Amino acid sequence: TINGNTVPVHPSGGFAYVVPLSIGKNTFKIKSGTEELNYVIMKPPAPPAGTYKAPELKEFENLKYALVTNDKSPLRSTPVDSGINRIAHLQKNMPLVIDGEKGNFYRVILGSQKTGWIWKGNVKLEESGESLAELKGYDYIDSDEFFIFVFHLDKMTPFELVESSPFLIKFYNVKNYPDNTYVMDFPVEKSMQKGKLLGYSGQFSGTDFILKIRKPVITDEKQPLKNIRIAVDAGHGGSERGTTGCLGDREKDVMLEYAKLLEHELKKRGADVIMTRKGDDYKDLNERVELANSENALFFISLHGNALPDGKDPNANSGTGIYYYYNQAKPLADDIIKEMTSQLGMKNDKVRQQSFAVVRNTNALSILIEIGYMINPSDNAKMINKDFQKKTAKAIADGIENFLKN
């Protein structure tokens, strides 16, 4: 009981119980058989409501020039430092033309018809600069795995890679093109198997921009995963423990078990598996992605156990959810969640687009799987069950195979 109220306990021994807190002192008496624990939790009063004034747009009388100071600086469609509003990730020393500011963001000119936003902390203003770049042409380089285009410019300039049909590469602030924007299309429907993008990348090397689009993958009908490179990412690790389940299991430990089982299942089917971590060690999020990219992985599968913010009822949330950022990865997520929910009997907690660091990677089809809610007693009991873990690995592998077949 908690304060005399009977708490439902799952057969596994786990439970989740929500008690609203009052302002000030909250006393909890927890009894289980002859054992009793007492806790005191203080809830401070809410701070007085202030008058928030949204920042206003200030347009400059004269254009300003800036250089990007940090690699992978997000160029955004709105002046908000979060969410799915990223246009591109800009490299250090890329020149920008600025025509205004709003709060902590500068407004960036993108051709004559479009603007973007960049956080002020990612740029430094320059005394002078040039507004337009010159595109001198491009070369096509054929390779076994990629369509490669090398665009020759006289300086770096903002760009955008658009996942559409056709796939578009746009260079902004380029002279001698309509709206100061160069656009080249790549016929995905004609060039790719069933019109599916399978990974791409674009970045400057000096003043040359190198665009790589992965070619269609030829699979073995009897063994679709044979020689397919797959990065398996066990979430968290080391000092980053992740969430804690109802029975004290740590997400970092449970996900490593899942990752090893998935590695075994994929290798059994002929896949080449890259593990972002093999033990209880801390790995930076970018380090995980860079490892997958250095090994030229086709898929990046990150495994996690879900949780909820304080105040949310764990009993009301359950099931398997999958997150992606770039649209090219959504069909993969759809195929995997279909297998996981049907084979494991888990509730479908939906496929969603979200700006998580490990899925903001275009080189591989990148997804993050929340296998279940570790703070939900029912989900947690399943997730620590060894037989369930093996079935999960099989369901994920089946989903990847279905994606390659369809």
Where are these regions (language model features)?
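Second-shell loop/turn segments in exported
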Residues: V80-G83, E240-D253, T276-Y282, G319-N327, ...
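Active-site histidine-acidic residue metal-binding/catalytic motifs
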Residues: R214-L291, E295-F299, P309-K312, A316-S318
